[in-house]
Amino acid sequence: MDAIQINPTDNVVVALRPLAAGEAVDAPGVGAVRSLEDVPQGHKMATRAIAAGDNVVKYGLPIGHVTCDVAPGTWLHTHNVATNLSGEVAYEYHPTHPVVEPVAPETFMGYRREDGSVATRNELWVIPTVGCVNEVARALCEGAQDLVGGSLEGVHYFPHPFGCSQTGADHAQTRALLVALSRHPNAAGVLFLSLGCENCTHEQVLDELGDFDPERVRFLTCQDVVDEQEAGHAILVQLAERARRCGREPIPASELVIGLKCGGSDGLSGITANPVIGRVSDGLVARGGTSVLTEVPEMFGAESMLLDRCVNEDVFHAAADMLNGFKEYFISHHEVVYDNPSPGNKDGGITTLEDKSCGCVQKGGSAPIVDVLPYAGRVSRRGLNMLCAPGNDMVSTTALTAAGCHMVLFSTGRGTPFGAPAPTLKVFTNSRLAERKPGWMDFNAGVVATGERTLDEAADDLWCLVLDVASGRRTSAERRGCHEISIWKDGVCL
């Protein structure tokens, strides 16, 4: 098979390999089409004549319109296709009531915390409340690596530039995100590290935390001690002793929470990696578990694939408000809502934001949407959730971690080395990338494009890997020491 028609109503196919000009293209269900020009892998080719102004249809939905008449076999990309997106939309609810057939959950070897929550890692986290103490946090963690061993799997810190010179909602958002991170069950112990004169004060963090376990969450204000390294190390020693009392035990997979993310997408993302992840998400929900879909701007143009799956009108209105609120966020900054696909996305075959979005939401599978979470919000309902966060890789994976995700399934067609605080599994969309960057990869979904595995077979393989990672197998990012955060800022800097 040279190319694929994703939906029978599509007027394009996607090249599964580079197509040469004049080549007869084999695409099941389409019939014979001869390429009029070279078509790179992952890019689109028209299967029939399309008049100027008419829609390009992919995934069964319009992903833009052609700007000139095109003939069958024409390469379709940014030179002859434009977006249909503009501003806010008056969404309507037409519920489809998707049904998920229950599946008996397997178990994984995880940690059961004293409060009943479940973890896939047993680590100590040092969280700076302000960027001024990032280097203090780094030195503390470097000096505490000898504590790692037994059931204590790591000591990590998460530098960021914020926590001071912020005001209002922007400041509150930073504080809420840091506190949400501290609640993650993978952190057996947390040290909030403060300077002492910043906006994000010790007292504000305490107020945001509410009820908490003082043996698990500790505080150190650097200006209040003579030697912050000595004081900090003593706290980490105490936290480590407590963490080592926890060991792995069988946990039902129904208690897993998995984040869904893509970055560096290409034209194969919506054909290989994202549908594979979507099937894993559906399987997790069928087992009674939870998955979380984010990247709100990368839902624009594909909203109908999501909104009609909301379980009731309250969830629908929350999702619609989130989508239009994000568009208003763009407009308030005098930006268009559709200027999203990156140069790498376009090189890989993604032409418009609708094109990117329709592929992006494949990660959400077909399960009902049960809840909509604000930024820095935490999961409270089992099933498929939507989370308000931007498409930026590091900001959104940080938000997924803060929401309580035990791991993140991250699809990529271009490759990326980073890792979130939660284990981040890189799912590659194509085998060429897998051959070129094996050190960044956890799973190659490119085998779907080559015909080596079906979508369902690849999803079964990925699910087995998910259980292994939940049981302690380290991801490629973890093996390289990548544990990073990025905070969504929307305000002035004093």
Language-model segment annotations:
Residues 1-407, 414-417, 422-494:
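Metallocofactor- and cofactor-centric catalytic cores in central/energy metabolism, strongly enriched
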